[in-house]
């Protein structure tokens, strides 16, 4: 692994999400994993049978992650005349689920995000108040 100094004058970001990494400098391995199940409703209601989660109903949480094949036969050579990484500024809106913002060298980076987002939106007619006749 390359060994260098990372110097950043300014880092500005609004959000660092679940299982995300902000790393300055060299690292051997970064491994991020997150599983998210979210329900969004237009009306705030809660039914008595909610709150339990059955992973068997959602195969996305049970499937094995697809991993890339390992590098084979790739040879490379680097010559760093200045052994430092200089960055004036980094401005990021957000680093999302299982992502990385990294300034430096890394031997291995893995990220796995599984999201199931259910939106229950009612039609505009059903949201309007009932008219009494």
From Swiss-Prot:
Annotated keywords: Germination, Sporulation
Induction comment from the UniProt entry of this chain: Expression is sigma K-dependent and negatively regulated by GerE.
Pfam families the UniProt entry points to: GerPE
InterPro entries: Spore_germ_GerPE
Any one GO biological process: sporulation resulting in formation of a cellular spore
Biological role: Required for the formation of functionally normal spores. Could be involved in the establishment of normal spore coat structure and/or permeability, which allows the access of germinants to their receptor.
Protein name listed in UniProt: Probable spore germination protein GerPE
Source organism phylogeny: Bacteria, Bacillati, Bacillota, Bacilli, Bacillales
Gene behind the chain: gerPE
């Amino acid at each position: 692994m390359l060994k260098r100094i990372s110097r950043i004058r300014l880092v500005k970001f609004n959000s660092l999400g679940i299982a995300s990494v902000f790393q300055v400098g060299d690292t051997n391995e970064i491994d991020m994993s997150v599983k998210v199940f979210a329900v969004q409703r237009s009306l705030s209601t809660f039914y008595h049978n909610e709150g339990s989660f059955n992973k068997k109903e959602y195969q996305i949480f049970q499937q094995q992650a697809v991993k890339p094949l390992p590098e084979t036969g790739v040879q490379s050579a680097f010559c760093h005349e200045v052994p430092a990484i200089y960055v004036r500024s980094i401005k990021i809106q957000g680093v999302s689920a299982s992502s990385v913002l990294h300034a430096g060298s890394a031997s291995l980076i893995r990220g796995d995000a599984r999201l199931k987002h259910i939106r229950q939106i009612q039609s505009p007619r059903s949201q309007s108040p009932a008219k009494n006749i």
